[in-house]
Amino acid sequence: MQSTQPIQRCALGSQQALPELAVSLLDNLGLITMTGNDKKSYLQGQVTCDVVSLEADQVTWGGHCDAKGKLWSAFRLFHYGDGYAMLQDKSAIDVELRELKKYAVFAKVEINVSDAILLGVCGVQAEQAIAKLTNNAEAAVATFAQGTAVKISPQRWLLVVDANQQDEVLAMLATAPLCDHALWDLYDILEVSPRIPAFAQNEHIPQAVNLQAVNGISFKKGCYTGQETVARAKYRGINKRALYRLSGAIEPSAPETTISLERSVGDNWRAAGEALVSYHFDDGRATGLFVLPNDLEPETQFRLAGQSEQLWQREPLPYSLDDE
C-alpha cells in the first residue's frame, strides 16, 4: 500500500549531522516469517545464530548458508506474531525463500514473505518517539496496537505494521519527515551492518561480512547447514575477507548507480568489488560497504572503477572483528 504522505529524499552533505528524527519507508527490505509447531527446531537447523536461546524481547543477527557455507542471506531475527521474522535485503528474498523452504516438507512449518509495511524510525529522538508509540522502549521487541517495534541500534527502530494501518502510524509520528530508504541505508553503512543483496548470494561465508563480529554466529549450537565451513573459518583461520566501509569523491550520477572499486597491487590496479550498499551525499561524495581481503596493507589505495582520479579511503570499523 502506498502511503498518502509524500516521501522525500533526505538530502545530506558528507559533513552534515543526521536528522534528529526521521522515518524511512523500507521498501528495499523484506520480511520472511516462519510459524508452526516445528518453527524453532527447523530454523535452528538452518541458520548460524542460536534460535533456541532467543528471548521474546530480543533481536539477533544471523545468516543462512548453502551446504558449502556461502550465504543465501544475512538477516536480523526476532519473534513476530506466533513465530519468527527475518529482516533482509529484498532483492535476495525470493531465492532465500526457496532455499529456506527446501526441507520444510518434512516439518510442521509455514514459511512466507510478509506483506507488512516496514518503516524505519531513526535519529537521536527515535527512542523517545518509540516510547510514546509503544509505551515500552525498554524491550528490543515490543508490540503495539498497530504492529511490532524492533530495536535495531541505539538510534534506530524498525516498525512492522499492517498495510491498512500505515497512515495511522505515520500520523502518530507526524513530527518526523517521511524519507525514502536511502537514509536507513546510510545508517547501515555507518554501522557496517552485514548485507547480502541478490548479486552477492553464494559469494561469501558469514565471517566475510562480519557476522561473527555482530554476534550473528553461535559456535556452541548444534548442526546447521554450512556449519563445517563456518567452524573451519574460525578455528583454522581460513577466512581471508571482511566487510569494510569506504568513502570518497564521486562524479555526479544517479543515486542508484552501482559503485565498484579497484585496489592498488604494486604499480597495478585490481578489481576490489561492488558495494553491497551505498549512499550518495549531496556534495559529490559517497560511501558504501565492500567485502575486501582482511590482510590488506595500510597503504593500499582504492579508486572508483571508471573514475581513476577519484581515490577512496577505508573508514574505521565501529566494532572489533574478533568473535570472542
Swiss-Prot record:
Q: Which UniProt keywords apply?
A: Cytoplasm, Folate-binding, tRNA processing
Q: Which SUPFAM superfamilies match?
A: Aminomethyltransferase beta-barrel domain, Folate-binding domain
- Listed GO MF terms: folic acid binding
Where folate binds, per the record, is at W184
| Keyword field contains Cytoplasm | yes
Where can this protein be found?
A: Cytoplasm
Q: Looking at the UniProt record for this protein, which Gene Ontology cellular component terms does it annotate, in alphabetical order?
A: cytoplasm
- One protein family per Pfam: YgfZ_barrel
Q: What does this protein do?
A: Folate-binding protein involved in regulating the level of ATP-DnaA and in the modification of some tRNAs. It is probably a key factor in regulatory networks that act via tRNA modification, such as initiation of chromosomal replication.
Q: Which family does it belong to?
A: Belongs to the tRNA-modifying YgfZ family.
- Annotated protein name in UniProt: tRNA-modifying protein YgfZ
